[in-house]
């Protein structure tokens, strides 16, 4: 969820841009599903579920990363 902030790099008042990136929880679930014998690539479904991914917040003006939220 984007947040309103003042960018410490460019000084502008911004609403952050959020990007979902695979993190430890995503890889852990993928590995667990693979080890328990899920076939036909079902283990890769973890990469399609945003609530399992980490979130990167960045400034829309200077494109710098402001915060990284780790799910695990």
Swiss-Prot record:
Top-level taxon of the source organism: Eukaryota
Disulfide bonds: none
GO-annotated biological processes: regulation of cytokine production
GO cellular component, one term: cytoplasmic side of lysosomal membrane
Amino-acid positions noted as binding Zn(2+) in the UniProt annotation, renumbered to this chain: 7, 10, 59, 62
Region (Membrane-binding amphipathic helix): 22-45
Compartment(s): Membrane
Keyword line: Membrane, Metal-binding, Zinc
Domain LITAF intervals: 1-71
PROSITE patterns: LITAF
Membrane-topology descriptor: Peripheral membrane protein
UniProt GO MF annotations: zinc ion binding
Pfam families: zf-LITAF-like
Keyword Cell membrane attributed: no
InterPro entries reported in the protein's UniProt record: LITAF, LITAF_fam
Major subcellular site: membrane
Domain notes: The LITAF domain is stabilized by a bound zinc ion. The LITAF domain contains an amphipathic helix that mediates interaction with lipid membranes.
Similarity annotation: Belongs to the CDIP1/LITAF family.
Name of the protein in its database record: LITAF domain-containing protein
């Amino acid at each position: 969820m984007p947040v309103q902030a003042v960018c410490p790099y460019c000084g502008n008042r911004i609403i952050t841009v959020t990007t979902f990136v695979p993190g430890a929880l995503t890889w852990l679930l993928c590995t667990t599903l693979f080890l328990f014998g899920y076939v036909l690539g079902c283990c890769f479904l973890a990469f399609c579920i945003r609530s399992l991914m980490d979130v990167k917040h960045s400034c829309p003006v200077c494109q710098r990363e402001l915060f990284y939220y780790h799910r695990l």
